Amino acid sequence: MLTRVKSAVANFMGGIMAGSSGSEHGGGSCGGSDLPLRFPYGRPEFLGLSQDEVECSADHIARPILILKETRRLPWATGYAEVINAGKSTHNEDQASCEVLTVKKKAGAVTSTPNRNSSKRRSSLPNGEGLQLKENSESEGVSCHYWSLFDGHAGSGAAVVASRLLQHHITEQLQDIVDILKNSAVLPPTCLGEEPENTPANSRTLTRAASLRGGVGAPGSPSTPPTRFFTEKKIPHECLVIGALESAFKEMDLQIERERSSYNISGGCTALIVICLLGKLYVANAGDSRAIIIRNGEIIPMSSEFTPETERQRLQYLAFMQPHLLGNEFTHLEFPRRVQRKELGKKMLYRDFNMTGWAYKTIEDEDLKFPLIYGEGKKARVMATIGVTRGLGDHDLKVHDSNIYIKPFLSSAPEVRIYDLSKYDHGSDDVLILATDGLWDVLSNEEVAEAITQFLPNCDPDDPHRYTLAAQDLVMRARGVLKDRGWRISNDRLGSGDDISVYVIPLIHGNKLS
């Protein structure tokens, strides 16, 4: 085991998986190279690149920055720019997509408001094939804008698939609740098919006395809507959207798991998406990409990063509860450094799943095993293998030269944050920034905000390209300039050698939704 671990640790700088830098296949893949691709590799469709342009963009020496040719291809005059890595993988493993989603109630679906109409439905499951909208005699649905970024590792397969299909899973999940969301004055029913009460959302539940008396609206009352128990939780509409996004991420991950036996879907990916629905932004993140809002020069974080360090306690607790997942090769405990055999019987600082601080424990044989989480900062890895703990894919990922699967420690669940556009009057320089970790590895939130607040005021407010140029400026600042000692940014710091993808989304368009 020690030899295997040394080999894995030696590959820390080679990529997110030990021994897989630049590879199109994850460890232990099910013969993926002999299977057809689920979707062909390419760059985001909204860039409008020809095949020749795609090939030219994959220049690891020049690293040309790609931007939108036509701003009308993205809603809200959104800006976008990207650049390929400096050679760590053959392809740019980032993927992006942006669409306007139309959500209609499924035909024949149970609804909370009988006799309401819904007009379009999917003619197939969300597998990206045969997707069309069919007219019927039911009500109008709702439209929402969708932006997404996927940062692939150990190949671009999972990122490409997620960029094509996740939006369909989101639409599918929203279809069951679209009529409920449109009726914001009434709290969601506990069971679909119940007629909602015509009362404000803040006065749904009965008092205990009314419930016991059997009065109007009480259990057993002959003239009122379904029973409302006084202990029933009040679920706001926003929680339904959050649940839909969480379910969509889970279904996307399950689809990748199912289809990897039929298609070559390499590696895994992080996922950062935004939907604008009924005047609110919902930002869902699984991985280490990041979203921030810059409003009047103020920075508003809209995501958290999920890494071995930030999720240490969750990972340790899982390993503590299910020690077989460690394969008798790892310890779930954390120590300041590797424990040496000569330290048996001595007391050393350690940290367990229930601790944020440190304590001393007597070193035992079990503590000599390799730690579940090893390394610091960007070099921290789960089982010396992967540096992100949430995302999609990675179903075949194993510890280097072993049969220990890492997927049980990885989660597809996103964190979802909400921003209410209607609460603010946004200016033309107020923006939402979405970017993969290639940007954030070298630029802080403050540096990005400073760059935006310096750049946008110097652009014509009526120039539709201003946000694309701002995205290009951010990518250029993070990539830097190629010098004798590699890519360098300001103050001669090392530039980002990773793939970089950036959206700059102007929030002024949200004013129209208020």
Curated annotation (Swiss-Prot):
Q: Where is this region: Disordered?
A: 109-135
Q: Which reaction does it catalyse?
A: O-phospho-L-seryl-[protein] + H2O = L-seryl-[protein] + phosphate; O-phospho-L-threonyl-[protein] + H2O = L-threonyl-[protein] + phosphate
Q: List, alphabetically, the Pfam families matched.
A: PP2C
Per the record, its GO cellular-component terms are: cytoplasm; glutamatergic synapse; mitochondrion; nucleoplasm; nucleus
Q: Kindly state a single biological-process term from the GO annotations of this entry.
A: signal transduction
What keywords would UniProt list here?
Cytoplasm, Hydrolase, Methylation, Nucleus, Phosphoprotein, Protein phosphatase
For the modification Omega-N-methylarginine, the affected residues are 213
Tell me the residues on which Phosphoserine occurs. 7, 124, 211, 221, 422
User: What is the annotated signal peptide range for this record?
Assistant: none
GO terms for MF: [pyruvate dehydrogenase (acetyl-transferring)]-phosphatase activity; identical protein binding; phosphoprotein phosphatase activity
Q: Its domain of life?
A: Eukaryota
The primary location reported for this protein is: nucleus
Per UniProt, subcellular location reads as:
Nucleus; Cytoplasm
Q: Which residues form the PPM-type phosphatase domain?
A: 77-507
Which EC number(s) does the record attach to this protein? 3.1.3.16
Residues with the modification Phosphothreonine, per the entry, are: 113, 224
EC top class named in words: hydrolase
Q: State the similarity comment.
A: Belongs to the PP2C family.
What more the UniProt record tells us is: May act as a suppressor of trastuzumab resistance.
Q: What does this protein do?
A: Dephosphorylates CDKN1B at 'Thr-187', thus removing a signal for proteasomal degradation.
What is the official name of this protein in its record? Protein phosphatase 1H
Organism the protein comes from: Homo sapiens (Human)
